[in-house]
């Protein structure tokens, strides 16, 4: 049975008139017009072919060695005195049993003037720079593609809208001027680094205008470095026992972090003080399922060891609320930040959904989630939910009309697209955060 591939992320423009959605290797654009009317505004697909690129690289290497091989062949003779010619190497290509190739699009960000969209592509480990033109039939136009030696994992855009900070899979951080011309071969040196995979990065500044880069990694670390003098480490924030998957920044130097621990950490990143921790263990237990059982090789005899992790934590822009979700669960947890005691967190609300949450984002004071709706019966729905704060009720509520109309817009936009309408077994892996957890084998 074929289904529309679930949405992997959403990003909304400042005024809410433009929404970008990631599905597999595509970015879909929609214009939002009140009341609850959506208009398809174009699609961009990453057509980069990994297999062909591998073949091209191999062909270049073979061509470069051809003259050398010819000289060596002259020296090789059989017993009869005939020259022996070497057989050219076969160009590699995936065969039976080879792991599938997933061309994820990640890390959607808009520049502050919203004239450009920045994203990352797994296909060639690149940073993508798009022009955004709301008057065009297709609002996105790819302008530049900066390729890296390792996969970009997280990005942050500087206030000048031209500098992008990139944190990669191998622990290095780079600074790229998106107005520059991309190099054919990546030669840039990192501006700072960790010894393990980076998971998040933020470029911020203090009240004196001094800039800092905050990075988190798989090794429980949060590092604060001066920018652009990144060789100067300002401080480390220690307290996590497991990996840090997500961080977000608020006013007055507030930093929130989460990951493989069963706690949310609140910090004053300027002083390095851990202000508080919020233990969500008992809150999330009713929402855990078989997907949270530890891998068999790390289980006990009763097969009841569970492992869970926060996939994303994000703050409301104007309201004192922060939301997060645990990977492979059907809820988001909203916390209220104390206005009297900086860093104090208290449960505000738990919102449940019919399917597991895949991503969480925020637009002003609205939270947005995408759902793993591949098991939706009948007409596929529940691709995303838009969650608004109701001042009269002092609570967050799902805007069902807006969400339902968005479902219809998604369905119409992908009709006849054999890439985005796919078999269930061909859906990209949607739960990757739990793989960051380290077990005994990582310490041996």
From Swiss-Prot:
Question: Which InterPro entries does this chain map to?
Answer: Trm82, WD40/YVTN_repeat-like_dom_sf, WD40_repeat_dom_sf, WD40_rpt
**Alphabetic keyword roster:** Nucleus, Phosphoprotein, Repeat, tRNA processing, WD repeat
Q: Does the keyword Nucleotidyltransferase apply?
A: no
Region (Disordered) location: 55-92
What PROSITE patterns has UniProt attached to this entry? WD_REPEATS_2, WD_REPEATS_REGION
Positions where Phosphoserine occurs in the chain: 93
An example GO CC term for this entry is: cytosol
User: Would I find tRNA processing among this entry's keywords?
Assistant: yes
Compositional bias, Basic and acidic residues, is annotated for 71-85
Entry's localization field = Nucleus
Q: Which GO terms describe its biological process?
A: tRNA (guanine-N7)-methylation; tRNA methylation; tRNA modification
So which domain of life are we looking at? Answer: Eukaryota
List GO molecular-function terms, semicolon-separated.
enzyme activator activity
Q: In which pathway does it act?
A: tRNA modification; N(7)-methylguanine-tRNA biosynthesis
Q: Where are the WD repeats?
A: 1-47, 48-99, 100-147, 148-192, 193-237, 238-279, 308-354
Q: Which family does it belong to?
A: Belongs to the WD repeat TRM82 family.
Kindly give any further remark recorded in the entry. Answer: Present with 5910 molecules/cell in log phase SD medium.
Q: What does this protein do?
A: Required for the formation of N(7)-methylguanine at position 46 (m7G46) in tRNA, a modification required to maintain stability of tRNAs; its absence resulting in tRNA decay. In the complex, it is required to stabilize and induce conformational changes of the catalytic subunit.
Q: Which PANTHER family match?
A: TRNA (GUANINE-N(7)-)-METHYLTRANSFERASE NON-CATALYTIC SUBUNIT WDR4 (PTHR16288:SF0), WD40 REPEAT PROTEIN 4 (PTHR16288)
What does the annotation say about its assembly with partners? Answer: Forms a heterodimer with the catalytic subunit TRM8.
Protein name in UniProt: tRNA (guanine-N(7)-)-methyltransferase non-catalytic subunit TRM82
What organism is recorded for this protein?
Saccharomyces cerevisiae (strain ATCC 204508 / S288c) (Baker's yeast)
């Amino acid at each position: 049975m074929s289904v529309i591939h679930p949405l992997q992320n959403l990003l909304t423009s400042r005024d809410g008139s433009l929404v970008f959605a990631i599905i597999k290797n595509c970015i879909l654009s929609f214009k939002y017009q009140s009341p609850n009317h959506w208009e398809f505004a174009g699609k961009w697909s990453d057509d980069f072919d990994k297999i062909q690129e591998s073949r091209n690289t191999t062909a270049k290497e073979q061509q470069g060695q051809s003259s050398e091989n010819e000289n060596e062949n002259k020296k090789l003779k059989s017993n009869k005195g005939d020259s022996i010619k070497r057989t050219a190497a076969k160009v590699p290509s995936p065969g039976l049993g080879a792991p599938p190739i997933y061309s994820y699009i990640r890390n959607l960000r808009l520049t502050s003037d919203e004239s450009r969209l920045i994203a990352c592509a797994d296909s060639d480990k690149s940073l993508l720079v798009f022009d955004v033109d709301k008057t065009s039939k297709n609002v996105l136009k790819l302008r530049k593609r900066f390729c890296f030696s390792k996969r970009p994992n997280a990005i942050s855009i500087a206030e000048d809208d031209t500098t992008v900070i990139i944190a990669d899979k191998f622990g290095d951080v780079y600074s790229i001027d998106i107005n520059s011309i991309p190099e054919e071969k990546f030669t840039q040196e990192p501006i700072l680094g960790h010894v393990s995979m980076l998971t998040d990065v933020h470029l911020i500044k203090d009240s004196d205008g001094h800039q800092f880069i905050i990075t988190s990694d798989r090794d429980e670390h949060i590092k604060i470095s001066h920018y652009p003098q990144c060789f100067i480490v300002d401080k480390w924030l220690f307290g996590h026992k497991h990996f840090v998957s997500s961080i977000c920044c608020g006013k007055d130097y507030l930093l929130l972090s989460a990951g493989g621990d069963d706690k949310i950490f609140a910090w004053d990143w300027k002083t390095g003080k851990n202000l508080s921790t919020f233990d969500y263990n008992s809150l999330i237990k009713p929402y855990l399922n078989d997907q949270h059982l530890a891998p068999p090789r790390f289980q006990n005899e009763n097969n009841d060891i569970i492992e869970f992790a926060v996939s994303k934590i994000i703050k409301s822009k104007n309201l004192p609320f922060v939301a997060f979700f645990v990977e492979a669960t059907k809820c988001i947890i909203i916390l209220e930040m104390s206005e009297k005691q900086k860093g104090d967190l208290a449960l505000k609300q738990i919102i449940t959904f019919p399917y597991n949450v895949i991503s969480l984002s925020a637009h002003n004071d609205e939270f947005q989630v995408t759902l793993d709706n591949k098991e939706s019966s009948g007409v596929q729905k529940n691709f995303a939910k838009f969650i608004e704060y109701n001042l009269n009720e002092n609570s967050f509520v799902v805007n069902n009309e807006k969400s339902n109309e968005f479902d219809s817009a998604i369905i119409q936009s992908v009709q006849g697209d054999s890439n985005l309408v796919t078999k269930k077994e061909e859906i990209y892996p949607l739960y990757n955060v739990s793989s960051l957890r380290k077990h005994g084998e990582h310490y041996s």
